[in-house]
Amino acid sequence: IADCAVCYTVDPKYPEPGFWAKLTGKSNPKPVFTDAYFLDKARQMAELGADMITIKDMSGLIPPRRVATLVKLFKKNIDIPVDFHTHCTPGYGLASVLAAIIAGVDVVDTNCWYFAEGTGAPAIELVHVFCKKLGVDTGVNMEAVAKINTQLREIRKELNQSVFGTEKPEPKPFNPLTDTLPAEIDALFDKAIKAAQADDEAATIDACRKIEAYFGFPAPNEL
């Protein structure tokens, strides 16, 4: 299929114009990367025959509210599936994926547990918990994911030695099919969902970061 990407980024932050700039009528450039800009790119690719549009956020810069806005905008104006791809580097990843799911996105990209979060994509295991609570059937064989994770853990250990020369901390093992979450952590998933549904961006991010911290994933902007 033709999966076409609308690459997300943000406008530079300019300093407030000084006295003389204002006096001479000079102002900062107008925003370029607006909702209308991204929708226009998506429409162009849909008209060219795209089978799916991916909101591609390689730097993890898109916060929950913005991705929810774009997902709803795309779903309203183009009639092909919408995918969302992001990373967790600045700390938005998991919260933004949750917001995208609640906004009606068709596909979200994830990583398996031992290669997730940090500079990677959100963990499929955490997304699975959210989807189960929301009544969303992902169609993913989580038993197969668990078997893959066993192999990925060994690969990660090898990479730690060959690439980093040290044993980097790994997240607590977690299989959503067999492990029971502590009540306070399970409640954080519910809190994040409620916050995302209420468009409370700060609370959504806070709850998701606490979930990630519990499992030992890197803090924002840490490897």
Model-inferred region functions:
Residues 1-223:
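Catalytic cores and adjacent flexible loops of soluble metabolic enzymes
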